[in-house]
Regions:
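A cross-family phosphate/adenosyl-ligand binding-site feature
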Residues: 41-53
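Active-site-adjacent pocket-lining segments in enzyme domains
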Residues: 3-6, 12, 27-35, 52-55, ...
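Histidine-anchored nucleotide/phosphate-binding helix
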Residues: 21
Length: 182
């Protein structure tokens, strides 16, 4: 069974984080919600409070098959400023493991070089963060071990793309049917 982490920052887009967690858990993927702050309690961009599973400081990112970044503001800024997040992204990328980001969060990958040479997408207005990438406006883009997506309205497609990457396209199709999607 695959094991991934989703980095939860205060100010994250709640739907982008929690939809992914819900759908991946339904598919049997072990996904840990890691708070990048000093508390398990996280407050999203729209004031919704939820509790992460662990503090990021209590886990080793090397133990995961991939990491996921929800977008939202100021959540994306908080992720980008966090040295543990940046270190984890570099380690995951160097190891060829999954890195998935949605909405504004793919801009982090453009700025730190993870997206260099990759086909990517993001929320409109962040195109300039990808000077060394091929930017497209598809809902979800998978290029090797990097998956990017546009925003809240594409969160289910994003989660299904992660299932396809980690398990199989059949598993993603089955999940879409099971949740009455499309």
């Amino acid at each position: 069974m695959s094991k991934v982490a989703i980095f939860m920052a205060d100010g994250c887009e709640e739907i982008e984080g929690l939809t992914v967690v819900d759908i991946l858990r339904r598919a049997g993927v072990k996904i840990d919600m890691l708070s990048i702050g000093d508390s398990l309690n996280v407050t999203g961009a729209h004031g919704i409070q939820f509790r992460a599973d662990y503090l990021m400081t209590d886990k080793n990112s090397d133990d995961y098959d991939g990491v996921i970044l929800p977008g939202g503001m100021p959540g994306t800024t908080n992720l980008e400023k966090n040295t543990l997040v940046q270190s984890a992204l570099k380690k995951q990328f160097s190891a060829g493991k999954l890195i998935a980001a949605i909405c504004a969060a793919p801009s982090i990958l453009g700025k730190n070089g993870v997206a260099n040479g990759k086909k990517v997408t993001s929320y409109p207005g962040f195109e300039d963060a990808f000077p060394r990438s091929t930017y497209v406006t598809d809902s979800v883009v998978t290029d090797g071990n990097v998956i990017t997506s546009r925003g809240m309205g594409t969160a289910i497609d994003f989660a299904l793309a992660i299932i396809e990457y980690l398990i199989s396209s059949d598993a993603a199709e089955d999940m879409a049917k099971n949740i009455m999607y499309k």
